């Protein structure tokens, strides 16, 4: 509850928080170890607090794997999160490119 109160205080000053989704490019599917914790992500804090957040592509690594940009908003304000993501995608070409499968 304390974390959520601190988050709400920050959100009084900004519309959204933008962070990387992950500490680097996406993990290749064949490199994922079943049952291993996914500790390199930054999504947990928003999930833990029940805050709306989404991840969109913001580029690609040198080997073609996607880089994620996370946008998080105020409690129950999914609309702003989606609008910011939509504006970013309209301003950049990343959503048009596909990673190797």
Language model features with spans:
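Structural helix-boundary/capping segments
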Residues: 2, 48-101
């Amino acid at each position: 509850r304390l974390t959520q109160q601190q988050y709400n205080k920050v959100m009084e000053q900004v519309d959204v928080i933008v962070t990387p989704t992950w500490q680097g490019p996406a993990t290749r599917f064949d490199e994922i170890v079943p049952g291993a914790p996914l500790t390199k992500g930054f999504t947990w804090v928003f999930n833990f607090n029940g805050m709306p957040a989404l991840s969109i592509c913001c580029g690609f690594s040198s080997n073609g794997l996607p880089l994620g940009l996370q946008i998080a908003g105020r409690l129950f304000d999914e609309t702003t999160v989606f609008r910011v993501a939509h504006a970013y995608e309209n301003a950049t070409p990343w959503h048009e490119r596909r990673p190797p499968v």
